[in-house]
Amino acid sequence: SAASDVYKRQAFEITRAEGIEAVNAKNVAAYLKCSTQPVMYNFATIEELKLAVFDQAFEYMKRKVVFPKGKKSEYPMREVGLDYIAFARSEPNIFRLLFESSYAERCPVDDLGIGLDFQPVIEAFAKFLNISIEEARAEWLIRYFMVHGLACRIVNQKVDYSDEQLLEFMVRFDAGRR
């Protein structure tokens, strides 16, 4: 319903600002200047609302990170990696929800590390390096673990690398993989 969409959007914004732990009927109602009753009328439990926020967060990440169709890049894998890290840096609470919270098990995972459609990137990478799709998929998995590790460290404020440093890591990684 339109009302439940409003509550989901507000819960998503609370999550972006404060983390999923801050999502409760009282906080959603306070932001919308209403009582908690309409919030709870639309969701059987707060857990149901949080699950809806997770789904919304996953769709949001897909729009921000997945290699846009038609976008041309000389280094598609590098670009996606940098976009992934940029997403983690700009949306740390959404990143934590998706990958580090008790809800992370809901994140669709496949043999590429996460259930996102990176096939266009893999195909471009295979063509760029003149390797098979299978080899490109294997390279993607190795890169995913490196990029995801950097993103996790940045999100948890263990390190903060500049964009230039991150690009240099990617360039060196690429040089070492050939």
Report the location of each language-model feature.
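Helix-turn-helix
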Residues: 14-48, 52
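Amphipathic alpha-helical packing segments from all-alpha helical-bundle domains
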Residues: 66, 99, 104-130, 137-141, ...
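Helical hydrophobic small-molecule/effector-binding pocket
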Residues: 77-100, 107-112
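Amphipathic C-terminal alpha-helical segment
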Residues: 97, 144-162, 175-178
